[in-house]
């Protein structure tokens, strides 16, 4: 059933809200009506924040995390352990691990995992830059913290093979996270323990 609206401007706003993930037209309508009840200045600030987000946010040239400048606050922090890299699938995983307060090293965001079914190969991910970082920086350990899915496991194995010639220690987070789960959805306690109880990758697979 096609919903009719008394205002073209309202319908236009609903159309835009409905493009967001998980937002249907009923929710979009509630959001639009909520904004109508707010002071105009609040709505302007909301809109300006969205525009600034899209136009001015950048990605760290080292780890590919989101940043307000060329280097993110994590990479620029001298108190972080510069010898440890935690490899994650996406930016949300960085936030999830940071919330555990159990990790003080650096990160490397791949931008996804190898998934032939989705047309994503090694060349589509930040793998070459990872290998370059390990080869050029004083990295002693690389922690693989990818989702416990078939694609995540495939990517883990590929990364291990790529990093093996460098001699760096490659570890993987403990299997406290259920198979098939994504890092960002794990609770903080479980995720924190998985990082602390990580094991050498070579001990976790059979060659």
Swiss-Prot record:
<dbReference type="GO" id="GO:0006310">
    <property type="term" value="P:DNA recombination"/>
</dbReference>
<dbReference type="InterPro" id="IPR023627">
    <property type="entry name" value="Rcmb_RecR"/>
</dbReference>
<keyword id="KW-0233">DNA recombination</keyword>
<dbReference type="InterPro" id="IPR006171">
    <property type="entry name" value="TOPRIM_dom"/>
</dbReference>
<dbReference type="InterPro" id="IPR034137">
    <property type="entry name" value="TOPRIM_RecR"/>
</dbReference>
<dbReference type="GO" id="GO:0006281">
    <property type="term" value="P:DNA repair"/>
</dbReference>
<feature type="domain" description="Toprim">
    <location>
        <begin position="83"/>
        <end position="178"/>
    </location>
</feature>
<keyword id="KW-0227">DNA damage</keyword>
<keyword id="KW-0862">Zinc</keyword>
<dbReference type="InterPro" id="IPR000093">
    <property type="entry name" value="DNA_Rcmb_RecR"/>
</dbReference>
<keyword id="KW-0234">DNA repair</keyword>
<keyword id="KW-0863">Zinc-finger</keyword>
<dbReference type="Pfam" id="PF13662">
    <property type="entry name" value="Toprim_4"/>
</dbReference>
<feature type="zinc finger region" description="C4-type">
    <location>
        <begin position="60"/>
        <end position="75"/>
    </location>
</feature>
<dbReference type="InterPro" id="IPR015967">
    <property type="entry name" value="Rcmb_RecR_Znf"/>
</dbReference>
<dbReference type="GO" id="GO:0008270">
    <property type="term" value="F:zinc ion binding"/>
</dbReference>
<dbReference type="Pfam" id="PF02132">
    <property type="entry name" value="RecR_ZnF"/>
</dbReference>
<protein>
    <recommendedName>
        <fullName>Recombination protein RecR</fullName>
    </recommendedName>
</protein>
<comment type="similarity">
    <text>Belongs to the RecR family.</text>
</comment>
<keyword id="KW-0479">Metal-binding</keyword>
<dbReference type="Pfam" id="PF21175">
    <property type="entry name" value="RecR_C"/>
</dbReference>
<dbReference type="GO" id="GO:0003677">
    <property type="term" value="F:DNA binding"/>
</dbReference>
<dbReference type="Pfam" id="PF21176">
    <property type="entry name" value="RecR_HhH"/>
</dbReference>
<comment type="function">
    <text>May play a role in DNA repair. It seems to be involved in an RecBC-independent recombinational process of DNA repair. It may act with RecF and RecO.</text>
</comment>
């Amino acid at each position: 059933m096609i919903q009719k609206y008394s205002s073209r401007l309202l319908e236009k706003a609903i159309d835009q809200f409905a493009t967001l993930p998980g937002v249907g037209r009923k929710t979009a309508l509630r959001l639009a009506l909520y904004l109508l009840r707010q002071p105009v200045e609040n709505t302007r600030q909301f809109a300006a924040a969205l525009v600034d987000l899209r136009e001015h946010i950048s990605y760290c040239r080292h780890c590919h995390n989101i940043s307000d400048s060329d280097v993110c606050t994590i990479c620029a922090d001298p108190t972080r352990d510069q010898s440890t890299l935690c490899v994650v699938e996406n930016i949300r995983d960085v936030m999830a691990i940071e919330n555990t307060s159990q990790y003080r090293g650096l990160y490397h965001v791949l931008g996804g995992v190898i998934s032939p079914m989705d047309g994503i190969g090694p060349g589509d991910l930040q793998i070459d830059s990872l290998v370059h970082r390990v080869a050029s920086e004083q990295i002693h350990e690389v922690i693989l913290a990818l989702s416990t899915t078939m694609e995540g496991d495939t990517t883990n194995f590929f990364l291990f093979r790529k990093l093996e010639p460098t001699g760096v220690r490659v570890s993987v987070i403990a299997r406290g996270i259920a198979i098939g789960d994504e890092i960002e959805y794990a609770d903080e306690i479980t995720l924190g323990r998985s990082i602390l109880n990580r094991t050498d990758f070579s001990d976790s697979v059979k060659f």
